[in-house]
Amino acid sequence: PGVVRGKEENQMKRILAIMFGVLIASTASAQMPSLDSIMKSIQDLPKSQSGGSGSVTDLKTTGAGIKEALAVGTERAVNSLSGVNGYFGNQAVKILMPDSIKRVADIASKVGFQKQVDAFVLSMNRAAEAAAPLAAKYFADAIRDMSLEDVRGIMTGGNTAATDFFSNKMRGNLYTAFKPVLAKKVGEVGATRAYKDLIGRYENVPFVNKQSLDLDDYVTNKSLDGLFHTVGEEEKKIRTNPAARTTELLKTVFGK
């Protein structure tokens, strides 16, 4: 047992040393490492001699490496959304005018209120950008609590297996955490004011019906949609290796 433990510790130290080196090098170049680069580093490690291919030692050490890779990937996703224009400047996740008031907004734009429409859209995205850092703790907790079976499922799953895992495990809790903070942020950045201004100017116009919208719910859900989309895009970087490499990694870990 002592020999096995020693070999496992040495293997873990090698993984951590590789990751530390990648992180230090990336810091020097002002860039975070990609998930792909970390997984390639782990892939190059020799198989554990303590239990052969697919041993518990292999699974634990490589599992730790996958967790670290996911930690880096989710951090990159959160950081990219947290900056100025993280949502607003990214067409894939930009929060657009809600469908329920889009007709009102279209009419408003055509009759001189484009400024109010633009302010409303911008303020929703600014609120999402301000709230995005909240997700970091939830990702960290989910990664920490991953079981070996969770890691196995992510390794053998589809292109967004980890993202699906996070969404299933976290979305409800994230919604609960995000909504009150976003409600506050929406008010701070003027989304509610812009919305009321936009709707208020047209609610008495004969050809426009008064519309209603749970703005906090809308912005919260759209913020989370954008968050998981971005994590999914980051995860796909893991899956871009040639099939042989992926198979080699799976053989190293699971003996397949």
State the predicted function of each range:
Residues 34-47, 216, 223-256:
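A cross-kingdom marker for long, charged
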Residues 112-185:
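Mid-length scaffold segments of soluble, non-membrane domains
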Residues 77, 147, 242:
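Residue-level signature of catalytic and energy-coupling elements of molecular machines
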Residues 15-24:
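Sec-dependent N-terminal signal peptides
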Residues 26-30:
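Sec/Tat signal peptide C-region and signal peptidase I cleavage site
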Residues 33-121:
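N-terminal Sec/ER secretory leader and immediately downstream segment
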Residues 181-222:
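An amphipathic alpha-helical core segment
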Residues 1-11:
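Short, Lys/Arg-enriched N-terminal segments with co-localized hydrophobic residues
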